[in-house]
């Protein structure tokens, strides 16, 4: 895609004229208004990283409201909230109570403390196969279907940390039992 000289900017995120109305609603542009650098950054952080990447990430490690297109991840405030029967019975509704997410954070911390060198490798995989791909692909605001599969490598890296959390928790429990503090 080639920009007119007056339209060149660093990090052009809102680029496809076919999606002008969607860009307008997300960024808050007026009709015919061109996005500024700050609005392009807002679109990248709010929509591309926030909605497109983090929502998919949290679907896998926190829970998912439903399998409807555009469904959000299941936040703690929604765990026990009464929802309509159609939503409650939706087979795509998953409530993990954020257990995998918390385990991943524990595993991340455990690996950082125990093995900083290999932590760097897994963290690099996590970033390069997640947020860096979001940055590189510059996806449009609408997709014909959910595209969470493009971030699968990032999810694998986070799954490593979930596994390491189990080892870390086991070590803590076994040291408590050995020292007779139970």
Mark where each language-model region is:
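Lumenal/periplasmic acceptor-binding loop at the mouth of the active site in multi-pass
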Residues: 1-108
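Transmembrane alpha-helix segments characteristic
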Residues: 96-103, 114-137
């Amino acid at each position: 895609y080639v920009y007119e000289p007056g339209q060149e900017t660093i990090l052009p995120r809102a680029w496809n004229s076919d999606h002008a109305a969607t860009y307008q609603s997300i960024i808050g542009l007026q009709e015919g208004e061109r996005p500024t650098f700050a609005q392009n950054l807002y679109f990248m952080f709010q929509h591309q990283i926030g909605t497109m990447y983090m929502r998919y990430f949290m679907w896998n490690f926190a829970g998912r409201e439903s399998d409807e297109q555009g469904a959000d991840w299941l936040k703690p405030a929604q765990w026990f909230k009464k929802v309509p029967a159609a939503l409650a019975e939706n087979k795509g509704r998953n409530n993990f109570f954020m257990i995998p997410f918390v385990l991943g954070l524990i595993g991340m911390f455990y690996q950082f403390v125990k093995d900083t060198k290999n932590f760097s490798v897994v963290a690099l995989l996590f970033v390069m196969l997640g947020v860096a791909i979001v940055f590189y692909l510059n996806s449009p605001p609408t997709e014909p279907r959910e595209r969470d599969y493009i971030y699968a490598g990032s999810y694998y890296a986070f799954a490593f940390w979930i596994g390491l959390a189990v080892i870390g928790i086991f070590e803590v429990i076994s040291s408590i039992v050995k020292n007779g503090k139970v």
